[in-house]
């Protein structure tokens, strides 16, 4: 088995999908989890205005709507959380995503004050954060807020990780990568677009250039620039297609060096890191 085949298998990726079937699969997955653990009353998700959180948010609200109708349990809710750092440049996209999702509840937590306070505390301890590490601080502050909300609403935190993100480890460890349940896991980027199109999402929310937008020195830096490969390259790789050797090597190098991000903390029983 080639490394490409191993990666495809590990991430559960498929070369082709039926959008309606995958929508149903994710919604049923969320519903089943909530029914298995009836003490869970809420799904909590940060909404950025990008493709992934828009899709995950819509699926969460669909699952909650169906469960309430089927069980009569009105205590169930989906909580969409806006987590800007100061003023977000694409705030209108966030509002458009909220309008599309129609969440039960919307909370806004501006993380800038908390991030600056943390940065100052570290500075006083003799640690000056680089712009890149400050970006990770933002991602972790966002996740901290979501877990606080989940803790106070008997909830779980929903993630947006999918195959095209997992393969490169393009997430912050214990930031946006630290979640309870990931309904998009298995899909590549273009497949996520297919689901949103089938759901009637406004096109500009999934046709915009994806960006983590964590760095102050490089605001709205496109993911594809940071990664050195395009999402079309990554999707083609996950669909088992042949790519130029250098492109495939770049993707595989990302996968291998970020393996620790896709695993629990390393113990004496692990040996994957010895490769």
Curated annotation (Swiss-Prot):
Presence of keyword ATP-binding: yes
GO annotation (BP), single: NAD biosynthetic process
Key words of the record: ATP-binding, Ligase, Magnesium, Metal-binding, NAD, Nucleotide-binding
Signal peptide: none
Gene3D superfamilies xref list: HUPs (3.40.50.620)
Annotated EC: 6.3.1.5
Pathway noted in the entry: Cofactor biosynthesis; NAD(+) biosynthesis; NAD(+) from deamido-NAD(+) (ammonia route): step 1/1
Binding site residues for ATP: 46-53, 160, 189, 211
Binding site residues for deamido-NAD(+): 140, 173, 180, 260-261
InterPro entries: NAD/GMP_synthase, NAD_synthase, NH(3)-dep_NAD(+)_synth, Rossmann-like_a/b/a_fold
A cellular-component GO term for this protein: cytoplasm
Enzyme superclass (EC): ligase
Residues noted as binding Mg(2+) in the record, renumbered to the chain: 52, 165
GO MF annotations, alphabetized: ATP binding; glutaminase activity; metal ion binding; NAD+ synthase (glutamine-hydrolyzing) activity; NAD+ synthase activity
Catalytic activity field: deamido-NAD(+) + NH4(+) + ATP = AMP + diphosphate + NAD(+) + H(+)
Known function: Catalyzes the ATP-dependent amidation of deamido-NAD to form NAD. Uses ammonia as a nitrogen source.
PANTHER family: NH 3 /GLUTAMINE-DEPENDENT NAD + SYNTHETASE (PTHR23090), NH(3)-DEPENDENT NAD(+) SYNTHETASE (PTHR23090:SF7)
Family: Belongs to the NAD synthetase family.
Binding partners and assembly: Homodimer.
Protein name: NH(3)-dependent NAD(+) synthetase
Biological source species: Escherichia coli (strain SMS-3-5 / SECEC)
């Amino acid at each position: 088995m080639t490394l490409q085949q191993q990666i495809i298998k590990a991430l559960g990726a498929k070369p082709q999908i039926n959008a309606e079937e995958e929508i149903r699969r994710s919604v049923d997955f969320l519903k089943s989890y909530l029914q298995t653990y009836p003490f869970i009353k809420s799904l909590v998700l940060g909404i950025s205005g990008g493709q992934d959180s828009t899709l995950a948010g819509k699926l969460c609200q669909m699952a909650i709507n169906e469960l309430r109708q089927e069980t009569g349990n009105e205590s169930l809710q989906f909580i969409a959380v806006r987590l800007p750092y100061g003023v977000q440049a694409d705030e209108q996209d966030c509002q458009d995503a909220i309008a599309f999702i129609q969440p039960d509840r919307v909370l806004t937590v501006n993380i800038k004050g908390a991030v600056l306070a943390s940065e100052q505390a570290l500075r006083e301890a003799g640690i000056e954060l680089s712009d890149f590490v400050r970006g990770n601080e933002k991602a972790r502050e966002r996740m901290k807020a979501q877990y606080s909300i989940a803790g106070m609403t008997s909830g779980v935190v929903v993630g947006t990780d999918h195959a095209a993100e997992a393969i490169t480890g393009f997430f912050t460890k214990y930031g946006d990568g630290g979640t309870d349940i990931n309904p998009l896991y298995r899909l590549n980027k273009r497949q996520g677009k297919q689901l949103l199109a089938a759901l009637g999402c406004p096109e500009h929310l999934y046709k915009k250039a994806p960006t983590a937008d964590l760095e102050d020195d490089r605001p709205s830096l496109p993911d594809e620039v940071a990664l050195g490969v395009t999402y079309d390259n990554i999707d083609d790789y996950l669909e088992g297609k042949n790519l130029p050797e250098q492109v495939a090597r770049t993707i595989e190098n990302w996968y291998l060096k970020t393996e620790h991000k896709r695993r629990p903390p390393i113990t004496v029983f692990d040996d994957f890191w010895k490769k």
